[in-house]
Regions:
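Short acidic-glycine loop/turn motifs at beta-strand connectors
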Residues: 95-98, 176-177
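Conserved strand-loop elements at the edges of beta-sheets that form or border functional pockets
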Residues: 95, 105, 165
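Structural recognition of beta-strand segments within beta-rich domains
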Residues: 85, 93-95
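Basic, glycine/proline-rich low-complexity segments that contact nucleic acids
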Residues: 1-85, 111-278
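Beta-strand/loop nucleic-acid-binding surfaces
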Residues: 98-110
């Protein structure tokens, strides 16, 4: 996969880059696996903004993804498709019974390739099996946190985790963030790397392209009024209050740790922040 650049016929095209879409084989999704997606604009059921900077953008249909494939299936890749709801490509696959699924596509998937799910299968690209059956050193994606719950980790474009060790019923994984953590060896994962490797190198190039993705502008707190942000106010403006930076709700930010889930600390062997400490 490559990145496509443009001749600067317009100012917006000067720094704009796009993906080349070479892996995609069709532009027509399967209607039975589509669902209407109502835009929430970052608001909850009470109409209050819970996620800022959301709203507008083009209309989309949601593709019904299957993150928990049944066991003992032989699946054939029918098409590789674009999905506007995620950074990775998706694969339309069919099992031996004629049932269709949408799954995350990896870098090795092409139209016509086959892969299997289950415990007693060969270790091949795209195969899905428990971590206990995967050799140490293998790169995996779409990893479960709880057996049978479906993939929750390593689903973004170009992502993969490496299986580092297996002992005492746990598998040790090195995550894309650099974190090393344990998960139950019975959790399933797919072998390979998520598709669309160059996604992180795409430059949007213009404000309009960002708005079409449903992202609204972000305003700095220092240019707001004092009632709207802890950094706001001041005659003529201030460029720093002399205090620690805070969020609009008064929480310390820019490096301040806000993680409270202490129950899973025992599963984290090495924090993703470890390499940043001096």
């Amino acid at each position: 996969m490559a990145i496509k650049a443009y001749r600067p016929i317009t100012p917006a095209q000067r720094k704009k880059t796009t993906e080349d879409y070479d892996q995609i084989t069709t532009n027509k999704p399967m209607k039975s696996l589509l669902k209407a997606k109502k835009q929430q604009a970052g608001k909850n059921n009470q109409g209050r903004i819970t996620v800022r900077h959301r709203g507008g953008g083009v209309k989309r249909h949601y593709r019904i993804m299957t993150y928990n494939l049944p066991k003992d299936l032989t699946l054939t890749v029918e098409e590789i498709e674009y999905d506007p709801n995620r950074s990775a490509r998706i694969a339309r696959v069919q099992d031996q019974n004629g049932t269709y699924y949408y799954v995350l596509a990896d870098t090795k998937m092409t139209k016509g390739t086959t892969f299997k799910t289950g415990s007693d299968i060969e270790v091949e690209d795209s195969s899905r099996m428990p971590l206990s059956n995967i050799p140490v050193g293998t790169f995996v994606y779409a990893i479960e946190l709880t057996p049978g719950r479906g993939a929750q980790m390593v689903r973004a474009a170009g992502a993969s985790a490496q299986l580092m060790a297996k002992e005492d019923g746990y598998a040790t994984l090195k995550m894309p963030s650099g974190e090393v953590r344990k998960v139950l060896a019975g959790c399933e994962a797919s072998i390979g790397t998520v598709s669309n490797l160059q996604h992180q190198n795409v430059k949007k190039g213009s404000a309009g392209r960002v708005r079409r993705k449903g992202i609204r502008p972000t305003v700095r707190g220092v240019v707001m009024n004092a009632t709207d942000h802890p950094h706001g106010g001041g005659d003529g403006g201030r460029h720093g209050s002399g205090k620690a930076p805070r969020t609009p709700w008064g929480q310390l930010t820019l490096g301040y740790r806000t993680r409270h889930n202490k129950k899973t600390n025992k599963m984290i062997v090495r924090s993703r922040h470890e390499g940043k400490r001096k």
